[in-house]
Amino acid sequence: MKRTLRNPGNSSTVGDVHDVFFEYDVSNVGRKRPRTKEEGYYESESEEDEDQILNKEKKEGQSEDMFSDTSEDEKRTLPNDEAQKRRDFIENGDAERLAHKGLRNKEVLNDDSDDEDDNGKYSKLRYEDIEGQEDTNQANDLDADEEGSEISVPSSPKRMSFNLKEDMEEGDFDENGNFIRKNYDPESQYDAWLNGSVSNKKSIAAAREAEQKRKEMENRRRNQELEEFSKLPFSTVPEALSFFIARMERDESILEFLQRQSGNKKSYKKKKNNTAEGISPERKSADAFRKKLIELITAGLTFLEDKIGKEDIYSETRESLQRIYQKLTSNSWSSPVSYDDSNSSQYNFKWEFDDKTYGPYTASQIQAWSNEGYFTDAKHAAFIQLANMDEWMYPNNICFCDVVSLKK
């Protein structure tokens, strides 16, 4: 019988062959039940017997986890050969070999945790007992791999080399080979004072002695500074400021002023003038005066740092010192000596390796020649002295407006 798709009610006989479209007939579609495959166990016409089917299932079951907990229902369904095989596997020590390769049994982990919680009491291993075990374990793993095992563990963790002596300093190994780190902190002795636990009488005495020595050194340094300050040509801060302002140029810092006083920019050719060293007496005298002047300047800077509390005094300019002077005295700074004073001191000058001395001249005349570069642009070095003094000086070391400081 054949039923058409357009008219399912009509049917016609077309031989004994069923039409393929018959199963798509809507009127004949009902609930489909899952079909049960009866292959393997109960098919009598199968070519495989029951023993061959069980062997096939054994091979498929080898991919499962051997260490998973097996319920009682599963144990009943397992064949006797499979259960016996698992018992033989554990008794032969294969599980222990896998544990060395990184697999840990759940029961072993629980036992280890119980040992660690036993009030921290454990048996320590000596260095001689531990040394060489790393190589032994690696050799055992290699032997096991060569013999071959029924279950292979891919991507097992690699062993990392370590320094046993350093580890023994940081902790100890118990009987099971577990490393237990020490709680001692070598830096804790430096932080003990934070907890108020410093009660050692010897340490307290040493700290008191160190504090006393520090105070003695501070007092000694202070007394030395006061002794140096007593030799200065000034005793107050305004006098010290006036000393520097009178010698500095416009927009010149103290550091630049100190460099200018330290040496001449131009080097002169030294000629031998009946002296063994080839240095004139005037130059020796000028060098000695320059050395005293540099010591006086540095002592004056220390005096200002101590009195006004400025640590960056070397960066101060002439104008900034004038502002400090005005703030302290409420008056603007003015030159202590006038160039036009007829009673001002007289100066002499001479050229190096020249026996003739020129002068005396007033301070205004010497200052005018110095500003024009008469002394600095000459072929030979020039030296200037006060008429009533024996010392010779370089032109850049003279302050024409503060003769009193130079005499000291």
UniProtKB/Swiss-Prot annotation:
GO process terms (BP): spliceosomal tri-snRNP complex assembly
Coiled-coil portions: none
Acidic residues composition bias: residue spans: 41-52
SUPFAM superfamilies referenced in this protein's UniProt entry, alphabetically: GYF domain
Region of interest: Disordered: 1-161
PROSITE patterns xrefs: GYF (PS50829)
Domain GYF: residue ranges: 344-402
Similarity remark: Belongs to the LIN1 family.
Protein name stated in the entry: LIN1-like protein
Source organism: Schizosaccharomyces pombe (strain 972 / ATCC 24843)
Taxonomic classification: Eukaryota, Fungi, Dikarya, Ascomycota, Taphrinomycotina
